[in-house]
Amino acid sequence: WNQGAPSIMARWNPIQGSVESLQDQWNQEGIAFKECLHDWSAPHRLFELKSPKGSPADSESFQQGKYYIQDPSTLLAVHLLDPQPTESILDACAAPGGKTAALSSLMQNQGTLHATDPDPVRLKRLQSNLHRLGIQNVRSGENLTQLGQASKAPSYDGILVDAPCSNTGVMRRRLDVRWRLSTSEIQTCCEQQSALLES
């Protein structure tokens, strides 16, 4: 159960060029690709990748920020939120930045997007990813205080909370979960999720 190697899925980043130029570059790099269609996503956004030269993440197109390796399932909440270029959005528990980047893409790199994560190591990874992807409408910090929002109650048009979870939904990519997950860890996740929603 869930023992097979998962597919490598990619989300095109329109901030760094057209999908046609990305596909041309994939062809030059020897990366085979197939479009993945979902009724909730616009065409030409999601692709399954296969590379004969190792990981697609080692490719120049990835380093240039033209795409982000990301499961389609992680994007559904982003599309349900439906952020607009004129809106103010909060992405809580944002690292490593996949959903933040997808939010920015739908906002056309405009509007106001605040991204927070309490883990400084993960926060640096988020900032590195956003820089690679050419995203400019994001302010990030460990909490709202770092974003200068402590003295006033911030008002957002939408809030995305990707709360800490058990990872049972991504066992194909996190094989260690089946061996390390415990009842107490699930209970801790529930408490953290409740605290986040109440805040």
Label each region the model flagged.
Residues W1-S199:
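S-adenosylmethionine
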